[in-house]
Each structure stands twice: as structure tokens, then as C-alpha cells.
Amino acid sequence: CMSALLDNGDEILIPSPDYPLWTACATLAGGKAVHYICDEQAEWYPDMDDIRKKITSRTKAIVIINPNNPTGALYPREILQQIVDIAREHNLIIFSDEIYDRLVMDGAEHISIASMAPDLFCVTFSGLSKSHMIAGFRIGWMILSGNKAIAKDYIEGTKMLSNMRLCSNVPAQSIVQTALG
């Protein structure tokens, strides 16, 4: 997904600590991973002032991992709204890694940031690897939502990349049908 977005030197905001694949993908695509602080003293929530300080003219997107891996933090609506406001102000794409969305506990509620930002372009990632404990089957998806008009080139690039791939394996397709009903 980064190859379709980033040109050499473009920046993407990524939480720290993060799941290392995000940094690797940004770097592999020729971009620069710019890490924003998620402070343990603040329940591992993103530091909005730090995010704002790190936005430049080269910043294309912001990544959130909610629920967060590795911290386990689940972002409340107020935190998500602040991220939406920053993304809106700076015309950033939102990449939302929500692979742990079905694994919240103690009555907590997961809120997808895309549901709060219909005017922004959001790319939401999820799958069955974690929630159904079938990581080896590599079953996942990305959902493009919001203002797709501002992301035509990105969508076209993503289509080209996906067309170069074969479909998932047959047992995995059967598992998806069973798991999602």
C-alpha cells in the first residue's frame, strides 16, 4: 500500500512504539517513516503536539494502530477525533491498522476511525489472523473509504499492485466464508 502512495522522500507518520512492518514498508517504498510518540504515562495514546510538530510539506499520511500493537492501547473517540482533525487540517490519508479490533476486553468498544471521517480518505486494514487464530493462512483485507476523489492515483496504483498478485489459497477462501458467514 505504501508503494502506491510514496515517492522518494515522502513522509508518513507512524506511532512509536509500532509494529515494525509499518516502518519497513515506508522505507521499502522510498519514503521516510517519521515516528510520533505514544507515551506510556498517557495510557500509550498518541501525543497530538508531537504529531503536529512532525508534519511537513512532505507528509502524506498518518498510521494509527488501534487497538495498538505492541502496547494494547485502545483509543477512545476523543483521541480518534483529534487525529481526524489533524488529518483534515493537513490533508493526510489515514492508514488504520485494526487487525485486533475483535479482541477488545472488559466491555471496551473499538471505534473504527473511518466511521468518523467520511470526508477523508481512509485505508483500513483487518483480517482473520488474530481474531480467529489462523495467522498462517494470511487472510486479510484493506477497505478504502471516504473521499476517494482525492486519492485517484493511489487507488489506481493499488489496483495495479493487486492485479499483479494471485488470489489467496483455496482453503483460506473457504475459511473466510465460514468465519464471516
Task: Please annotate each region the language model reported.
Residues 4, 24-26, 86:
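Hydrophobic/aromatic ligand-binding patch that stacks against planar heteroaromatic rings
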Residues 27-34:
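A short helix-loop-beta submotif of the ANL/AMP-binding
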Residues 115-181:
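Conserved core segment of the aminotransferase class I/II
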Residues 18-22:
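Conserved coil-to-alpha-helix start sites within the AMP-binding
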